[in-house]
Amino acid sequence: MAKLTVKDVDLKGKKVLVRVDFNVPLKDGVITNDNRITAALPTIKYIIEQGGRAILFSHLGRVKEEADKAGKSLAPVAADLAAKLGQDVVFPGVTRGAELEAAINALEDGQVLLVENTRYEDVDGKKESKNDPELGKYWASLGDGIFVNDAFGTAHRAHASNVGISANVEKAVAGFLLENEIAYIQEAVETPERPFVAILGGSKVSDKIGVIENLLEKADKVLIGGGMTYTFYKAQGIEIGNSLVEEDKLDVAKALLEKANGKLILPVDSKEANAFAGYTEVRDTEGEAVSEGFLGLDIGPKSIAKFDEALTGAKTVVWNGPMGVFENPDFQTGTIGVMDAIVKQPGVKSIIGGGDSAAAAINLGRADKFSWISTGGGASMELLEGKVLPGLAALTEK
């Protein structure tokens, strides 16, 4: 990577500002999935082991007005992080002001402080989300000229807590997580070991147009599953019953199929049901067509076999988006089948692009079989699309 990383700077005795991604799910104040906290530990531990004083910034959920602050405090995260680090985490519970400044100035080498949810600053004019220059400058002033960005999940956003701080420090560097995310995803797309197969699922073609276009140029094959299958089907005149379709994207789907030169591989059958919820009948279709009064909710057994064949011998696989409504056991067979087809390839570099695919791999017990699972759905999508991420662009060049 052509950007400075945390290993390129002297941290001893320095107040080091760190953007992490602690945007974790909370239920009644309890963290229900701590993966993002765990993912940030190597960078935090490195900073404190080097004698730095880690000052952490993160958002949590969306905060638009004062009432939204309830249930969006990072207090439970501070407690969880302290337990994981085996040391106290200072948590002043504010995003600015004398109390925060005093707590930061009282830090000793090897200590950790967590600033309150950066999006609390969005209540007054969206200062965080709109990258207010004064806020970025203020937060930068709390440190000693070093900023570590380890929040891949927000790298596609230009916020005060990443791009804003970067613009006001001497050195803005990548943390280990950000470095790994970029290395795995960018290298897979730009310099893959071939054959390179991309698998795209999810419900909407509109979410993935740019990704499909970019991957058709880079990959050897692009497999399509999930709800967007039916927009591609309808574009070819195939009956789709009551399946999800984006009528305004039929021309786009048709154009992608024409451009693909046979690289785009669609399912050849579906698992269909007579309703999305409260269905009384589930069955496999004979071929591509979905029956009248039914909707396709997963790829069928013939498609799983076809995708398995398409993946044979693959050396690089990037997967983004489930094959069906995997949260429902009746419609998770396709996602499981594709996951198993990926991970059984000898010597394959397998990457999951965050979001629902990551949730599927974790929930269905296959997370440890993949080379890399991205922590950022939106950011990984933009990398797959070939876009420049603002949070990455703002870092100091080597």
Curated annotation (Swiss-Prot):
Pathway: Carbohydrate degradation; glycolysis; pyruvate from D-glyceraldehyde 3-phosphate: step 2/5. Signal peptide: none annotated. GO terms for molecular function: ADP binding; ATP binding; phosphoglycerate kinase activity. SUPFAM superfamilies: Phosphoglycerate kinase. Keywords: ATP-binding, Cytoplasm, Glycolysis, Kinase, Nucleotide-binding, Transferase. One of its GO terms (cellular component) is cytosol. Its EC number is 2.7.2.3. It comes from the Bacteria. It catalyses: (2R)-3-phosphoglycerate + ATP = (2R)-3-phospho-glyceroyl phosphate + ADP. The keyword Cytoplasm applies. Substrate binds at residues 21-23, 36, 59-62, 119, 157. GO terms for biological process: gluconeogenesis; glycolytic process. It is an enzyme of class 2 (transferase). The keyword Cytoplasm applies. Disulfide bonds: none annotated. ATP binds at residues 208, 296, 327, 354-357. Belongs to the phosphoglycerate kinase family. This is Phosphoglycerate kinase. The lineage of its organism: Bacteria, Bacillati, Bacillota, Bacilli, Lactobacillales. The gene is pgk.
